[in-house]
Amino acid sequence: AHRTVAGAATALPPYRYFQLGLGVVCMVMIANLQYGWNLFVDPIDQQYHWGRAGIQWAFSIFVFTETWLVPIEGWFVDRFGPALVVALGGILVAIAWVIDSLADSLSVLYVAAALAGIGAGAVYGTCVGNALKWFADRRGFASGLTAAGFGAGAAATVVPVREFIAA
């Protein structure tokens, strides 16, 4: 299929809807790192008595690394391709969840937060960036749907995570 984007005819990849769907799934998978964080704060404090302020620093580290390192992650996408960057981002997120489960000090929690932020930023930035690239003719639709995956992931999993923590 061909579309005219800003006056230029461009060939649209036939697999772009599949790729968009994969991007949404990836966003669903990383959502609870950010939107589900508050579910973990009180249980962590009750177990370790680190204080809410100290524990919340982990979230600040996560948000900082998730957002401010995206330009560097974008460089990696340009150099090595989106599949590798998303895969490595997913691996970092998985490692961070494991470290979180084993964290016995704030410094370990902070390391996990940094790794989670780097991984989530790699996934988020790459998926949104590629949605824009694959859907130059429907940028708002593609980026909105991809970003909605982030919110949908939280909406679908917050209650089960809360129940799991309470069990």
Predicted regions, residues:
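Helix-to-loop junctions at the C-terminal end of transmembrane segments
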Residues: 68-82
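Helix-loop-helix hairpin linking two adjacent transmembrane segments in secondary transporters
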Residues: 150-167
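Intracellular juxtamembrane helix-capping segments at the cytosolic ends
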Residues: 44, 122-135, 142-143
